[in-house]
Amino acid sequence: MRYLATLLLSLAVLITAGCGWHLRDTTQVPSTMKVMILDSGDPNGPLSRAVRNQLRLNGVELLDKETTRKDVPSLRLGKVSIAKDTASVFRNGQTAEYQMIMTVNATVLIPGRDIYPISAKVFRSFFDNPQMALAKDNEQDMIVKEMYDRAAEQLIRKLPSIRAADIRSDEEQTSTTTDTPATPARVSTMLGN
């Protein structure tokens, strides 16, 4: 019986490892991006803190922006916008529920390669209770903080796709240089007599 349980457990581990299954909230950051520079206009802002936390959770060593190393990829955080749209209304016409939309733009600069733009969009619903103004503000602040965390997770999850795009562009460059000869074939301009 113990042998059967061990066999089933081993089989389950092999199946989940073979299909690419991984734990939630973990991203396989490419090895070329394990050392990175985080560049932000607001280094102590909520998005910068959330991205810094996610990078550290994924084993990325962050270097200072003023570092002398120029061979390190850089994640540059750009514009953040939060919009509120009315999702539902009370009978009297007041807004009952908002849908909040956070859009984050960033770019990844790989030295000697290219600049890759990435973005993240997070949606959350927020109930607007007019009788509880203070509680409403606190709840909205908590939701916005959670949205920053989710946006940071989405940005970090896009790092492997950037690495794949970088590899793909390298392959395209090598295939175009090997397909076309460096010098055109020689053509004789002499006419026969």
From Swiss-Prot:
Region annotation (Disordered) ranges: 166-193
Membrane topology: Lipid-anchor
Lipid attachment, kind N-palmitoyl cysteine: 19
Keywords: Cell outer membrane, Lipoprotein, Membrane, Palmitate, Signal
Subcellular location: Cell outer membrane
Biased composition (Low complexity): 174-186
Domain of life per record: Bacteria
GO cellular component assignments: cell outer membrane; transporter complex
Pfam families associated with the record: LptE
Record's signal peptide: 1-18
Chain residues carrying a lipid of type S-diacylglycerol cysteine: 19
GO terms under biological process: Gram-negative-bacterium-type cell outer membrane assembly; lipopolysaccharide transport
GO molecular function: lipopolysaccharide binding
PANTHER family: LPS-ASSEMBLY LIPOPROTEIN LPTE (PTHR38098:SF1)
The protein's assembly and partners: Component of the lipopolysaccharide transport and assembly complex. Interacts with LptD.
Function: Together with LptD, is involved in the assembly of lipopolysaccharide (LPS) at the surface of the outer membrane. Required for the proper assembly of LptD. Binds LPS and may serve as the LPS recognition site at the outer membrane.
Family the UniProt entry places it in: Belongs to the LptE lipoprotein family.
NCBIfam families the UniProt entry points to: PRK10796.1
Protein name: LPS-assembly lipoprotein LptE
Source species: Shigella flexneri
